Each structure stands twice: as structure tokens, then as C-alpha cells.
Amino acid sequence: MFRDSAKIYVKAGNGGNGMVSFHREKYIAAGGPDGGDGGKGGDVIFVVDEGLNTLIDFRYKKNFKAEPGQDGGTSNRSGKNGEDLIIKVPLGTVVKDELTDMVLVDLIKPGQTCVIAKGGRGGKGNQHFATPTRQVPNFAKSGDLGEEYSLILEMKMIADVGLVGYPNVGKSTILSMVSAAKPKIANYHFTTLVPNLGVVQIEHGKSFVIADIPGLIEGAHEGVGLGHQFLRHVERTKLLVHVVDVSGVEGRDAVEDFDTINSELQKYNQVLSTRPQIVAANKMDIPGAEENYKAFKEELEKRGYKVFGISAATNKGLKELLYAVSETLKTLPDTILLDETQNEEVVYKVQEEKPFEIHIEDGVYVIEGKWLRKVLGSTNITNYESLQYFQRALKKKGVITALEEMGIQEGDTVRIYDTEFDYTR
């Protein structure tokens, strides 16, 4: 089964907690703090595996969690770091944040790796909190939480050439005749429901990869006829071979078919309207096709297109078509065209968040902020010294000032995620 999209959840490992301990040794009455640091949580890492060609594995496993770091030990011993979790994905996988729909990474290189979720830092042991005035720190920091995301994976095939056109115009037959690929072929619409890849060998060792894109229809850019799923794969190709049925047996006009498909490509992604095209007028073996072909070729050559009359069923004209494709590919950049505007460097940036937000809910001051979750997670709220450390962090970030400007009073309740505090000056 082919699968070109999936939704998964990833969670990096939490950092291990710092240790609270004091040096104990015979004849040493006042051993200092020697609590070790917690280990770092494991990262979640995507790795491109060229042996994969579908996202089907993510149909059965959707939740991925890396190993947490171990807690620190006595005698300044640090906890062991958690192991990274490696997730293998096919070449051409696009990773999106489900919440924002923002592209996080586009995996287009063999062996490419990407840390998609970073493990939490290990908490500091109490050895780090000794000062001249606090020689016996009775607290340590908890480990930071590992990053977690709900992700959308989309696979976009990578090929040199894409065969596009209406359903049942002969794209799969062409692929089967020019390569070793064995796509499903039948005389009805949407026989091909998944993209198929084939390698075309030209003499003297020259070759290129060609993809049979399932048939497109009017409204494909809006998802009609599974259009979104099919058009996704066209974006990766450097050259399009636009296959048109000139036999007239379907009762459609060949020029109108050509214009309709190009309109759908343009509406889906403006970049596709500028993608080079070679036109293959197929089914020339059917009576009446020759006359239709002459008018069709004349019109498209006026527009500057190269047009080849072929019959995929009899092999007529395929050799000439393939040589034209091979020669055209030589003139095109040897790079993968991405989803974004051509000739423009794509930089993915995480949206900047406000340091914190405060709102009042049923008389309770609710404070939210990504860094707050981390700081609170690393605080031992049952320890007075650790709480003091947390309060200083809030004051430094301006949270206390913001609360006072909102009119908070002594004894009012403050909630930070799942933890509530009474406000005191």
C-alpha cells in the first residue's frame, strides 16, 4: 500500500533531575554539597532512508518518545544521557507543525538528518547552588521537559520528469513502455491511484527518473478527484511531459484538455505554471487521431511548445520523445525545485512567542508562557529555597511587575499551568 501523508506525535526525553546530597566521609565533619547533574533527555531525529518509498509504517505507529535522562547521583556523579530516537523517513518528506501548518524541514537529500525535537537539559545538582552565604543548599533543579510536537508528514516524490494529464490518456502505458516499472493499466478513469516511478535508460549510460502522476481533472487544485494528493508530487519534478489524448474518443477537445490541466497546475502552485513542458499527443494509432493531431500541434507550436505525436500502445514516436526529454533536462538546473518561489532561499523560522501572557479567569490570575513551563518543571515546589529561586526568575522576567500593574492583591490566586500559588509581596 502506498501512503504519502501521516500524522504523528513526537516527544523528546525529559532531562534528569539534579541530586541533593552532601559529602559524607569519615573524619570530615562538614562535607560540602556534592549532588550531581541530571542527564540530558534524548532527541527525536529524522533520518532520510533511500530504501523507503512510502509513509505506510506511520499508519501503525504514531507515537514516538525518546529516552529521558537519568537523575544525578551523589559524589558529583552526573546522570546518563537519554538515547536519541531515530525515525527513518523516505526521501522527499516534508515535516509540518500540525498546530501552525508551518514547514519545519524539507528532507530532500539522501542521508539527511534533522533534530525535530530536542531533549530537555539535565537539572543542576545542589553543588552548583553553594554560595558564601548559602553553604548548605538543600535544593537542586529538576530536568527540563523535552520538546513535543504533533506533526504532519507529507511525502513528495522526487523525479526528473513528471507525466501529467487527464485520467486514461495513457500515462501509465508510456511509463511501462519506457522503463521497467509495472503500473496498473486498464481502460477506465483513475486506474492509477498512486504515483509510480521508473528509470529511463538512454544510450551511452544516460538515464533519468520519470514519475507517472495519477490523472488530474478540473477542480484538482481544490482537491477534486484527490487532486491535492496528486498535485503534491508534481512539485518535485524539473520537467513535465504533458500527455494529451488526440484520438477524440472521450468526446473532449485536446486543446481544451491541455489548457484545463495547465490551469489546475497554476491554481495549485504558481511556480508550476513556469515549469518547462514537452507535449506528448498520444493514441495516434486510433483512426481520426492524425487529423486532430495536426490542428492540435499547430496551435501549441504557436505557443512555443514542442509537440510529439506518439502511440504508447505501439511504441510509435516514444524514442523521439525520450531523446527530446533527455536533451531538455541537460539545460535545466540539477537541483530539486522546492515548494517556495524559485531562485529564493528558503529559511524556516519558528514563530517568535511572547515571553508570557496573563489573563484573569474566575478571579484567578492565569500565567502562560513556554519558558514558564520549563522553569516550573525544573522547580521543586516543596522546597523553600527552590521556590525562592523560582520567584527570582519570575521577577527577572517581569512577571511580578505585570501582575502588580493588573492590580493583583495580597492573597490572590495565581495559576501557572497546573500549579496554583497565593500571591504575597
Swiss-Prot record:
Domain OCT: 348-425
Annotated binding of Mg(2+), by residue: S172, T192
Main localization, broad class: cytoplasm
Pfam families to which the protein is assigned, alphabetical: DUF1967 (PF09269), GTP1_OBG (PF01018), MMR_HSR1 (PF01926)
GO process terms (BP): ribosome biogenesis
Catalytic activity, EC: 3.6.5.-
Any one of the GO CC terms: cytoplasm
Gene3D superfamilies recorded: GTP-binding protein OBG, C-terminal domain, GTP1/OBG domain, P-loop containing nucleotide triphosphate hydrolases
GO MF entries: GTP binding; GTPase activity; magnesium ion binding
Sorted UniProt keywords: Cytoplasm, GTP-binding, Hydrolase, Magnesium, Metal-binding, Nucleotide-binding
Cellular compartment(s): Cytoplasm
Protein family membership: Belongs to the TRAFAC class OBG-HflX-like GTPase superfamily. OBG GTPase family.
Role noted for this protein: An essential GTPase which binds GTP, GDP and possibly (p)ppGpp with moderate affinity, with high nucleotide exchange rates and a fairly low GTP hydrolysis rate. Plays a role in control of the cell cycle, stress response, ribosome biogenesis and in those bacteria that undergo differentiation, in morphogenesis control.
Protein known as: GTPase Obg
Organism listed in the record: Ruminiclostridium cellulolyticum (strain ATCC 35319 / DSM 5812 / JCM 6584 / H10)
